[in-house]
Amino acid sequence: MARVKRAVNAQKKRRSILEASKGYRGQRSRLYRKAKEQQLHSLTYAYRDRRARKGDFRKLWIARINAAARLNDITYNRFIQGLKAAGVEVDRKNLAELAVSDAEAFAGLVAIAKAALPQDVNAPAA
């Protein structure tokens, strides 16, 4: 049986790892063992952060909606409660976009939410 030499495959594997690790600092872009280790970590971080990105954007949208809602004298919590009571089904991504780009439309939604809110039981009688 013929002897199998792995030189070509090994070089191809090493070259692909080193090409993928271009841009890393120091030894991590030049030495195969360091590059392989860094590549493993990099792919792990990328996988983790693709999932974390969804929560990060949701936090950003909520912060933007809250800021715009407070400009209209209502908190984020009461605003969302009012929208649900009114049956308005606009997601947070679109609400945040409205808050940034179209303040008048957002103010209209705030008015709808305020109208749909139940009267506060603990509010002082006027």
UniProtKB/Swiss-Prot annotation:
Coiled coil: none annotated. One of its GO terms (biological process) is translation. This is Large ribosomal subunit protein bL20. InterPro entries: Ribosomal_bL20 (IPR005813), RIBOSOMAL_L20_CS (IPR049946), Ribosomal_protein_bL20_C (IPR035566). Binds directly to 23S ribosomal RNA and is necessary for the in vitro assembly process of the 50S ribosomal subunit. It is not involved in the protein synthesizing functions of that subunit. The keyword RNA-binding applies. It comes from Nocardia farcinica (strain IFM 10152). It comes from the Bacteria. CDD domains: Ribosomal_L20. One of its GO terms (molecular function) is rRNA binding. Gene3D superfamilies: 6.10.160.10, Ribosomal protein L20 (1.10.1900.20). One of its GO terms (cellular component) is ribosome. Belongs to the bacterial ribosomal protein bL20 family. HAMAP family: Ribosomal_bL20.
